Amino acid sequence: MKNIDEQIKIIKKGAEEIIDAKELKEKLIKAEKENTQLVVKLGLDPSAPDIHLGHAVVLRKLKQLQDLGHKIVIIIGDFTGMIGDPTGKSKTRKQLSSQQVMKNAETYEKQIFKILDRNKTDLRFNSQWLEKLNFKEVIELASKYTVARMLEREDFKKRFKNQQSIGIHEFFYPLMQAYDSMAIKADIEFGGTDQRFNLLMGRTLQAEYGEEKQIAIFMPLLEGIDGKEKMSKSLGNYIGIEESAKDMYVKVMQIPDSLIIKYFELCTDMHPDAIDIIRKQLNEDKVNPRDIKMKLAKEIVCLYHNEAEALNAEIYFKNLFQDKEIPEDIPIFKVRSENNLIEAIVKINSNTSKSEARRLIAQGGVKLNGRKVIDFNDIILKSNDVIQIGKKKIVKLLVE
């Protein structure tokens, strides 16, 4: 196991906030002295089973701690998932059935172990302890927190102010998530910055029950390839961890230069010192950002595929955008038969308006099957048509 200072450097890499950094060092010193592992927790709500790089930010951090010799515990919220995490929601979420939750959990499990070592990961379901609580114990748990404190939470506060309903069961979500920390005696819990309330609740509850408080480590939310909104499947700006090596490589190359370092920090296992060198090179204009981005794309593809596939993806990219070739196996994009070219462009580029799409065409920035589009009014889109928008965005259509 690495020395304490080196461990802290790795743990801090890319982290937005650590509560409390001093306590973290004390826990690491104690673990080293007693030759024990720290219990590192991540809770997952299995309501959205497909994992993209934004979700993987925390999983990659867990892998780093796993490699440092600590115990990783993944808690699948099969019990809490039937409520659904209300974080950031403007209304009560529809409850999932236990069958839906378990089906999603199976998909999660398959994807999690593309990142974590299955043999060194403790996978738990919180129904194992939450289902066993009797009503007396639930009342005792509820007594540890007040409604006033719950309403300090931003999403609840907004809904209360706007006279939108808040189910009492929704107040139990952060309490149950906090109880998970007690059940496994968590030393550290990871989450996104949007999970702040839930993670700090874990610290509060542990203290209420006389246990040692967990360290809460918050990872930043990752912007999608558009560089504007957080990565989201619904916004179409995501990179799925199960995408092909070629699609993954091409998508990484689409991120703005301003996000290169952030992606290195959050999406790769590159050592912080190596990232500092790249940061310095970029700041001093000693390298072409495009070359560094290609290095980033290769690093990411290697993590989810292998070096050979990453090399093939790089060749594919060079053929596509440097030698102006259009390979057959490009990403497929679904459009409806009634969509015209303008509507298709807006769908493909989620942040492009119809007027911007028309301007792109007028500027010669759109190609259909290798030819610049001049008059789009009479174009009828067909399956297997290839649309190229700008220099990097290229898709093959599937018309439904």
Curated annotation (Swiss-Prot):
Reactions performed catalytically: tRNA(Tyr) + L-tyrosine + ATP = L-tyrosyl-tRNA(Tyr) + AMP + diphosphate + H(+)
Chain ranges of the S4 RNA-binding domain: 339-399
Any one of the GO CC terms: cytosol
GO MF term (any one): RNA binding
Ranges spanned by the short sequence motif 'HIGH' region, renumbered to the chain: 46-55
Positions with a binding annotation for ATP: K233
UniProt record, GO biological process: tyrosyl-tRNA aminoacylation
Keywords: Aminoacyl-tRNA synthetase, ATP-binding, Cytoplasm, Ligase, Nucleotide-binding, Protein biosynthesis, RNA-binding
Record EC number: 6.1.1.1
Motif ('KMSKS' region): 230-234
Family: Belongs to the class-I aminoacyl-tRNA synthetase family. TyrS type 2 subfamily.
HAMAP family assigned: Tyr_tRNA_synth_type2 (MF_02007)
Assembly notes: Homodimer.
Protein name: Tyrosine--tRNA ligase 2
Taxon lineage: Bacteria, Bacillati, Bacillota, Clostridia, Eubacteriales
GN (gene name): tyrS2
